[in-house]
């Protein structure tokens, strides 16, 4: 497989790295997996300097840029209204909306507000520290607790599902996760840790042989 590397993406990686962001934070910012973010951080400067247009990758990842939605509170409100409609159509009973930090938080906030539900924030371990230490994600103490509650989880993009898997495992220790809703799904998963996954948009790669 061959992956076309966008020069603007490479420049963005270099900028984020120079600003002191960790690999986990860069993965979150670009909506790519930790493996892809690590590869980009290690190779972006070389790729940009040599102006390579294509590199071979064992696995293809897709760069998602949804800032035209995220930069507007009004547009985010439209997205949250779609999620609210989905939740109502499924007749799911729940007590709190869990927003996965960072990008899932604004959407979760709007959904919780529209439905009159509590708001919980989950901070993944990739935002707490880098590799090498045994750490877990955490539930922010500044927002609603989840103990013994029914929860709907909201995130922006699911790539491999590892962050949501981590989140669900931790939540299951104290509450009952009912559903995961994401803006964009790149994983192709229908459920994570037994919890149904509902995407607004699902992205898949198709290999087309050139003749």
Swiss-Prot record:
UniProt-listed CDD domains: PRTases_typeI
According to UniProt, the name of this protein is Transcriptional regulator GfcR
Task: Provide the alphabetized UniProt keywords.
Answer: DNA-binding, Transcription, Transcription regulation
Provide the gene name from the record: gfcR
Give yes or no: UniProt keyword DNA-binding.
yes
Against Pfam families, the record matches this protein to: Pribosyltran
Domain notes per entry? Contains an N-terminal DNA-binding winged helix-turn-helix domain and a C-terminal regulatory domain (or effector binding domain) resembling phosphoribosyltransferase (PRT) domain.
State whether keyword Acetylation applies: no
| GO BP term, example | pyrimidine nucleobase biosynthetic process
A GO term for molecular function: orotate phosphoribosyltransferase activity
Query: Matching Gene3D superfamilies, A to Z?
Result: 3.40.50.2020
Say which family it is in.
Belongs to the purine/pyrimidine phosphoribosyltransferase family. GfcR subfamily.
